[in-house]
Swiss-Prot record:
<dbReference type="InterPro" id="IPR003329">
    <property type="entry name" value="Cytidylyl_trans"/>
</dbReference>
<dbReference type="GO" id="GO:0005829">
    <property type="term" value="C:cytosol"/>
</dbReference>
<comment type="similarity">
    <text>Belongs to the KdsB family.</text>
</comment>
<keyword id="KW-0808">Transferase</keyword>
<comment type="function">
    <text>Activates KDO (a required 8-carbon sugar) for incorporation into bacterial lipopolysaccharide in Gram-negative bacteria.</text>
</comment>
<protein>
    <recommendedName>
        <fullName>3-deoxy-manno-octulosonate cytidylyltransferase</fullName>
        <ecNumber>2.7.7.38</ecNumber>
    </recommendedName>
</protein>
<comment type="pathway">
    <text>Bacterial outer membrane biogenesis; lipopolysaccharide biosynthesis.</text>
</comment>
<dbReference type="GO" id="GO:0009103">
    <property type="term" value="P:lipopolysaccharide biosynthetic process"/>
</dbReference>
<comment type="pathway">
    <text>Nucleotide-sugar biosynthesis; CMP-3-deoxy-D-manno-octulosonate biosynthesis; CMP-3-deoxy-D-manno-octulosonate from 3-deoxy-D-manno-octulosonate and CTP: step 1/1.</text>
</comment>
<dbReference type="Pfam" id="PF02348">
    <property type="entry name" value="CTP_transf_3"/>
</dbReference>
<keyword id="KW-0548">Nucleotidyltransferase</keyword>
<dbReference type="GO" id="GO:0008690">
    <property type="term" value="F:3-deoxy-manno-octulosonate cytidylyltransferase activity"/>
</dbReference>
<keyword id="KW-0448">Lipopolysaccharide biosynthesis</keyword>
<keyword id="KW-0963">Cytoplasm</keyword>
<dbReference type="InterPro" id="IPR029044">
    <property type="entry name" value="Nucleotide-diphossugar_trans"/>
</dbReference>
<dbReference type="InterPro" id="IPR004528">
    <property type="entry name" value="KdsB"/>
</dbReference>
<dbReference type="GO" id="GO:0033468">
    <property type="term" value="P:CMP-keto-3-deoxy-D-manno-octulosonic acid biosynthetic process"/>
</dbReference>
Length: 272
């Protein structure tokens, strides 16, 4: 079964919890979770988008009391985790333990720097796991629209198999077109991947994940993959150890995330 575009979107058919990892120690934008976006801290704005999904519960998982207090001030549920976690997945695994989530309970990892996340996308990624029991994880992607994004190492690409499962994620331009002229990829501003390469269009990975709580705990106990370290992409750990990742294809590009001061100003303008 291959991944389907938005025409076949469905809401999650199993109960799930949204967890939003948040930490203050961003290297490119210190204090990012509490950055003001139209009168709300960014992590609060993310949570308030997520509550419009079908999730039973939306929580922020943080190691900082300031984030905890900001969430409480705006009616957002949050829990305090240890400060020594190596990744957001480790933080969420601790949160699952604190919450006593059963192994089969679905958890959706929504990044705390995605203030324009679509609730419908959260539902679609949650719905992957009941629909695709062979997959340990779910995520999302959309077709790349420009050559600049295709070649940008900050834009993570994903290649799928015929069943809509991820084969590989990379910062490199994949799939690489040996004869780009045959696919209309030559001119600046072209739209590679829109109906080209017989279903193997260049796809931009969207950083949202679903897992069952038991799988998340298992994943954090696995050794890091060499490819994970080389690419600095944590999801490659699952593929390295033989687990499958189902990918929801959406026709709509995700709203801009916030990694830099320039990103922050861009989102502020969008919220005016």
């Amino acid at each position: 079964m291959s991944a389907a575009p938005d025409a076949q979107d469905s809401t999650a058919n199993d109960r799930f919890t949204v967890l939003i990892p948040a930490r203050m120690a961003s290297t490119r934008l210190p204090g990012k979770p509490l950055a003001d976006l139209a009168g709300l801290p960014m992590v609060v704005r993310v949570a308030k988008r997520a509550v419009h999904s079908a999730a039973d519960r939306v929580l922020v998982a943080t190691d900082d009391a300031r984030i905890l207090q900001a969430c409480a001030a705006h009616g957002v549920e949050a829990i305090l985790t240890r400060a020594d976690h190596a990744s957001g997945s480790d933080r969420l695994a601790e949160a699952c333990a604190q919450l006593g989530l059963a192994d089969q309970h679905i958890v959706v990892n929504v990044q705390g720097d995605e203030p324009l996340i679509a609730p419908e996308l959260i539902d679609a990624v949650a719905a992957l796991l009941p629909a695709r029991p062979e997959a340990g994880m779910g995520t999302a992607a959309h077709a790349i629209a420009t050559l600049a994004d295709y070649h940008n190492p900050q834009v993570v690409k994903v290649v799928l198999d015929a069943r809509g499962l991820a084969q590989y994620f990379s910062r490199a331009p994949i799939p690489f077109a040996r004869n780009p002229a045959e696919h209309g990829w030559c001119s600046a501003g072209a739209a590679p991947g829109m109906g080209t390469l017989a279903g193997h269009a260049p796809l931009r990975h969207i950083g949202i994940y679903s897992y069952r709580a038991g799988f998340l705990r298992q994943l954090t106990q696995l050794a890091p993959a060499p490819t994970e370290t080389i690419e600095a992409l944590e999801q490659l750990r699952a593929l390295w150890h033989g687990h499958r990742i189902a990918v929801h294809l959406t026709a709509a590009a995700a709203g801009p995330g916030v990694d830099t001061p320039e990103d922050l100003e861009r989102v502020r303008r969008l919220l005016l």
